[in-house]
From Swiss-Prot:
Keyword Cell inner membrane belongs to the record: no
Species this chain originates from: Nicotiana paniculata
Major location (coarse): secreted
UniProt name for this protein: Defensin-like protein 1
Keyword Secreted in annotation: yes
SUPFAM superfamilies: Scorpion toxin-like
Keywords assigned by UniProt, alphabetized: Antimicrobial, Disulfide bond, Fungicide, Plant defense, Secreted, Signal, Stress response, Vacuole
Length: 106
């Protein structure tokens, strides 16, 4: 009986630590590639462009077929500036990103 009690205490402690580390995990920042030319069809060329821009990964967006680069955020909850020239372009990019995230969640 004492063994099962110790095992249960260990299991609960392990689960609490696992959950605590998951909550503190860094979020991922993303930005459109500045060097990738044209439409993004396959991942390898996009990833190569993103690695050359000092990102850790790159993937093609599903709707707009743009190369999106990813890396761990330095500041939690803050997105990397995409270099948009005007407010209308930023709003369009944000709307497309939100739509894409919503579609990926479903």
């Amino acid at each position: 009986m004492a063994r099962s009690l110790c095992f249960m205490a260990f299991a609960v402690l392990a689960m609490m630590l696992f959950v605590a580390y998951e909550v503190q995990a860094k979020s991922t920042c993303k930005a459109e590639s500045n060097t990738f030319p044209g439409l993004c069809i396959t991942k390898p060329p996009c990833r190569k462009a993103c690695l050359s821009e000092k990102f850790t990964d790159g993937k093609c967006s599903k709707i707009l077929r743009r190369c999106i680069c990813y890396k761990p955020c330095v500041f939690d909850g803050k997105m990397i500036q995409t270099g948009a020239e005007n407010l209308a372009e930023e709003a369009e990019t944000l709307a497309a990103a939100l739509l894409e995230e919503e579609m990926m969640d479903n």
